C-alpha cells in the first residue's frame, strides 16, 4: 500500500532492506535501490526498485554462445533461466512485482542499437551499477539507463554467493569490442570490468559467475 501511495520515499530510504525466503528455501535480502526510477512498458513511473544484496546461490553463464548478437533480450539467461527465478519468489511477492521496461544494447557487426525487454526481474546494466560507460579500462555503449544510488562505491557492489566471493553479470555488452562476444560484469572486489569472449563463461579467473537481479514493486 505504501509503495503504491506515491509516498514510499517518505517512509523508507535507499538501502533499507527486506528478507525473502524463496520457494526453494533460499533466503535473500533485497534492498531499495531507488525510488521512481523505472517505468512500466506503458511509461508509468514505478514507485520502488529493489536490488538483491546477495547473488543467487545458483549462478552460470549469460548466454549459450560467445555472442552479444540480440543483446540481453535474446540471451539464454533471460529466456531460459529468469522465468524459473521469478516463479520461485513467494506468491505474495510475485503479486506485487511490477513489470518494468529495461533498455540494453544488441551489439553485432551491424551496429549497437538500443533494445528493450519487459520483465518482472532483470539483470542490472553497467550504467545502473557504476553510472558511466567507461570504467577500469573497459566500456559499454550508452543504453540510456542511469545509476541506482545504492551503488556508490566498489564496496557497495560486492556480492556473496553461498557465503563466498563471486562475480556477477550485467546485461551490458562490452563495446566497442569487435569480437561481439563479451558482457560487462562486476568483479569480486566490486569493480565493473569485462574480459575477452566471456558470454558463455561460468567462471571468471577461478571465481564463479552469478546472478544479482533487480525488480520493481508498487
Locations of regions flagged by a protein language model:
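Collagenous Gly-X-Y triple-helix signature in extracellular proteins
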Residues: 1-218
